[in-house]
Structures are given as C-alpha cells and as structure tokens.
Amino acid sequence: MISSVQNVSNLSMTRALGAVDTENSASSSAATMPGTAGAANNMSFASVMGNMASDAVSSLKGAESMSFAGIKGTATTREVVDSMLQAEQTLQTAIAIRDKVVSAFLEVTKMQM
C-alpha cells in the first residue's frame, strides 16, 4: 500500500493517471509481496511514514506558494489549479492513512490480553 501511495505522489498532474514511471512500477511490484516491502529498500515503517509526511508538507507548501504566485500574476491559472489539485490529492491521501492508523490502533486496544 505504501508503494502505491508513493506512486500516486510521483504522478504529475499533466500526465494521465495510468502513466507511471517504469522504474517505480517495477520496484512497487516487488515491494507488494508480503514481507518484502521493508527488506527491498531497507527502510523502516517509521522512516517511510516520515518521508511521506515530509513529502506531503512540501506539496502543500508548494501549492501555497503557487497560489501566491497566481495572486501576484506570475503564474498561470492552469499552474495554480494543477498545484492545488495535487495538494488536495496529497491531503486526501494523508487523511486516509491517518484514518487507517487510528482504526488499527483502536482494534489493537480492543484486543484482550
């Protein structure tokens, strides 16, 4: 799932959603097998989540700066809209991941010990 989220964040707003870099899709197919996601690139779950959070923050900051550029008139409307749509997609992904983590935590706390 994490590799799919990374592939989504790597998509450009100007390319079709089905177009993914072949390098990323090849590595994601190997990483989707159970038990190999962390072993494929030697990254821990915490570091992957940290990288995703920092990517999300940079995407949101980029959209904010692009909106200011649009207000100043230095960016086209299309650039501003593309940047805002990418930021919205990033935010929706972060919210979905947060909801899944909270749900998993609640399930663990309901377990009897």
From Swiss-Prot:
Asked if RNA-binding is a keyword of the record, the answer is no
Q: Cellular component GO terms, alphabetically?
A: bacterial-type flagellum basal body
Where does it localize? Bacterial flagellum basal body
In its UniProt record, a GO molecular function of this protein is: cytoskeletal motor activity
Asked if the record carries the keyword Cell inner membrane, the reply is no
User: Which Pfam families does the UniProt record give?
Assistant: FliE
Kindly list the biological process annotations in GO that this record carries.
bacterial-type flagellum-dependent cell motility
The UniProt keyword set, sorted, is: Bacterial flagellum
Similarity field? Belongs to the FliE family.
Question: By what name is this protein known?
Answer: Flagellar hook-basal body complex protein FliE
